[in-house]
Amino acid sequence: MPQDNEQYPPGLLGEGLELADFFISRVPDPLIILGQKYDFFDVRGFKEISEEVLYFYKLFNSEENFSFFIGTNPHGYYTDAQKEMVSFFCKIAKREIINLEPEIEIEKSENLFASKKRNVILEGSKPHYIILKENSEEIIKNRKKLNEEELKENIRKCLKILENIDVPHYRVLPFFSLKGKIIGRYAVETEENIWVILKKVNAEKPYFLEVEEEINLYIPDISSEDEIKRDNKFKEGKNYFIDVRGLGESMPVSKKFFFHPYGYDYMFDGLFILFGESYLGKRVYDVLSVLKLLNSKGCKRINLYGNCQGAIIGVFVSLFSDLIKSVSFKNLPESFYSLIEKPYVKLPSSNFPKGILKITDIPEILDVIGKRIEIKIS
């Protein structure tokens, strides 16, 4: 179901509210809801809302003040809905319906232009990315400098990450062979019914999760399997990969649709916003949970590698985990602010923590991390 960002009120579902509640607040005042059978917003939701609202109008003995209509068109405000609206208004106002099908005068195109030259930017308006840039600069200018503990506390709140993380349950999955390498697979339950996939390259005992004291852990951009295929020169030592929720093996669609403007990643991110959570924060939490498992299995030192989306996740993981010995980030954005300066970026919206610039930015986090571990960026 395509939705634009303004249709994701932060924390709405988390507070127990739903769309119907906004209409219920109008009871017993007159209200008509207009829908369409072939709308890409599923008509089942429209019917459910209408039935809930009608129930409350009945409680107030004002059933005559409520109506809902489902037309036979796709998304839009068509003639059938217009007629229904006018009829309802006239009923409430106790007015006679004079003409439901008036003659429509088609305006000339030039009379409908928003500006003389058909370009509002030429008339002095600012594009949205310039407004964002200016607002961000003001936020950054007034941002308080935080010490390491303050930084961790504020980012933890921003990403909604629990301070205490238990060792997660895991189960062994069937292994497979890739480019002559045996790949062990392990499903790690980071939350109830949320399974992320841990992979071990060249696993000698793939039916058993045996972890070395020092390992290399890779967080891929989209898919661990793709990066295993591409990388013929693994670092020395034992190499592990992790597919966090919504990436790799848990992607609900094929990779070619991942960056679709209204794709699943965008929708999942929006749902987390509605629940007052952070999709990126949950991915960071996934990795931190896996680190707890690896530590319980005897791992004491981790060399962390992150590519693009995985690098962003890795920045926050490195801040919170003492197991990390070194980090290597590939295709890591210079900063969140640098992405705001551009009119368009391909990076999915799920990688932008809401409100992060009020707290910090990537370079400041790297400065803190760099005081205790080695950082390489390419």
What annotation goes with each model-predicted range?
Residues 306-309, 331, 377:
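Residues that line or immediately flank small-molecule/substrate-binding pockets and catalytic motifs
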Residues 27, 34-216, 222-238, 245-297, ...:
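Alpha/beta-hydrolase-fold serine-hydrolase catalytic core, especially in secreted/extracellular enzymes
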Residues 303, 326-328:
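Residue in the alpha/beta-hydrolase core beta-strand immediately N-terminal to the catalytic nucleophile
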Residues 1-4, 331, 337-341:
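Catalytic or ion-translocation cores adjacent to nucleophile or general acid/base/metal-coordination motifs
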